[in-house]
Amino acid sequence: RICPRILMECKADSDCLAQCICQENGFCG
């Protein structure tokens, strides 16, 4: 999957860019 390396806070996968997923630490990855 393609995930830009940008530190983004999230609550759900939809908060993240591209194919990033929301990880347990509260950040996209």
From Swiss-Prot:
Q: Which CDD domains match?
A: PlantTI (cd00150)
- Pfam families hit by this protein: Squash
- Any one cellular-component term (Gene Ontology): extracellular region
Supply the alphabetized keyword list.
Disulfide bond, Knottin, Protease inhibitor, Secreted, Serine protease inhibitor
Site, as annotated: Reactive bond: 5-6
Family matches, as Gene3D superfamilies: 4.10.75.20
Subcellular location, principal: secreted
Which GO molecular function annotation, any one, does this entry have?
Answer: serine-type endopeptidase inhibitor activity
What InterPro entries is this protein classified in? Prot_inh_squash (IPR000737), Proteinase_amylase_inhib_sf (IPR011052)
Q: Indicate where this protein resides in the cell.
A: Secreted
Q: List the disulfide bonds.
A: 3-20, 10-22, 16-28
Domain text from the record? The presence of a 'disulfide through disulfide knot' structurally defines this protein as a knottin.
In the record, the note on similarity to other proteins reads: Belongs to the protease inhibitor I7 (squash-type serine protease inhibitor) family.
What exactly does this protein do?
Answer: Strongly inhibits trypsin, weakly inhibits chymotrypsin.
Q: What is this protein called?
A: Trypsin inhibitor 4
